[in-house]
Each structure stands twice: as C-alpha cells, then as structure tokens.
C-alpha cells in the first residue's frame, strides 16, 4: 500500500509555506522542503525559508542540511526525502512536501532518481529539447527507440525517452507514494506584484548583507547560483547601481515563476487553485480531508 502524501507546489511568492503550515496543523503533519536552495545554512532571506517561529510551530525538514560550499542534487534530495517521509509516516503523521523545485519533486514522485555522472542540468536540457515536439512526434521517437508505453501520454513518453537516453543515470524504482498535488497560482499581474513586493521585503530584512556575505566567501559555489544572490553580484563588483541590481532580481524572479508554472502545468498531474478566489483555503483543506479519508 502506497503512502499518502500531500504535495504543495507553485511559483515563488504564491504562499506555499503558509499553506503547508496550515495543512500540517490541521492534519497532524510535518513539512518537507522541496526547494533546492533552502538546504543551505546561512541563506535564509533570499531563499524565503520558513521563519524560526514557523519552524517552531510545525516541524520542518530538509532545511539547513548543507554548508554553502557543498553541492546538492536531485539524487541527494530524493534519497533524503524518502528517509524523511518514512520517518514521518512511522510516527503516524502526514508528510507535506512543499516547494518550487519541480525537478526534485517530480523525481521523488515518479519513482526514479538521478544518479551516475550526468549533471541534472544536462537532463533538464534534454527535457527542454523534447518540449517542441508534438504528441505524434514524441510517439514516433518512442517507437524509434523501441520503447513500449501503456496508455500513452506526453509525460510518460518524455520520461521513457529520458531513461533510454541517459541509461543507468536514470534508474527506475518502485513508486512509493500516492500524492495529492496542489498547485497554487494567481492572476499573472497579481503574482508579479507579489513577487516585487516580496523582493522589497527581503531587502528590508537584510538580503543585501546576506548576499554580500555569500559573495565575499564563496561566489562560485552552487549555492551562489540561485536566484536571489547572483543578481546582486554585479552591484558588488561595481558594474551596476543598486537600483539596477534590485530590478534585475525582480525580473529574474518573475521569469523564474513563469518557468515554474510551465513545469508544473506540463509535467505533473496537479490540481490548480487560484489564491485570489474566495474560500480557496477551505476548499483545499476539504479536498485534502476527502483524499486522506478515501
């Protein structure tokens, strides 16, 4: 019997953390971060980690588990998330995965992990190369590769082609979970306004100092490549004004949100909720209750 879990995804600044905490309180749950940047100690503001008060109210996992000089991959996430979910479930509690790193969450849910020597950037690039193909063209590629896909759909076709292309670097494993995947969204202009406002709040909270600390200590590590930090490095090098760097960060974050939505819409079977609609949280909680009782 597969373990039921709740998965909360969506673009940055849409309110995933707040919803995850509310779900955890209502259903005796614990939150597992599905964010590739929140694993790093010392990077708190730019990664929008749950506050110390929020983490005290509800247990959070896979936050602050790496130093900024250490790497972190989808393989690491899947391995650690599986152990964490098993521990949460063994204590009779509900695991709630919340985050915006689509590759990590999809890898966990679809029963394979990324191992071997292939960087996940190469896998992302390969996936992106398949996007322009129509369903008919994908079916032809699947046939050419000698693959058989029961109940053909686009997602299964792309996954099968990835496995065939990368060989042992994509290892099939048993699918362990029965997820309810909730994707939060907002009207585009409202979402962009939320993003701009959150960036302003981050600067008020000390983002510039946090980014400067990273720039001074480890500007070339993986942790420094995340949105929220690298956009400020030109300012530290004297190549941009502060206002130019701040606007660059806002623009990069808006573009990132758009890519996140595209990923969740095209690659995962989600239930969308518009956060601006009246009573949306009550409807989400009702759906979760029905899912858990089923």
Swiss-Prot record:
Cystine connections: none
Enzyme's top EC category: transferase
Record carries keyword Ubl conjugation: no
One term of GO molecular function: ATP binding
Superkingdom assignment: Bacteria
Site entry (Interaction with substrate tRNA), positions: 101, 127
EC number(s) given by UniProt: 2.5.1.75
Interaction with substrate tRNA: annotated span: 35-38
GO biological process, one term: tRNA modification
Positions annotated to bind ATP: 10-17
Cofactor(s) required for function per UniProt: Mg(2+)
Stored Pfam families: IPPT
Positions of substrate binding: 12-17
Keywords linked to the UniProt accession: ATP-binding, Magnesium, Nucleotide-binding, Transferase, tRNA processing
Reaction catalysis annotation: adenosine(37) in tRNA + dimethylallyl diphosphate = N(6)-dimethylallyladenosine(37) in tRNA + diphosphate
Assembly notes: Monomer.
Functional note: Catalyzes the transfer of a dimethylallyl group onto the adenine at position 37 in tRNAs that read codons beginning with uridine, leading to the formation of N6-(dimethylallyl)adenosine (i(6)A).
Family: Belongs to the IPP transferase family.
Record-given protein name: tRNA dimethylallyltransferase
Organism: Streptococcus pneumoniae (strain P1031)
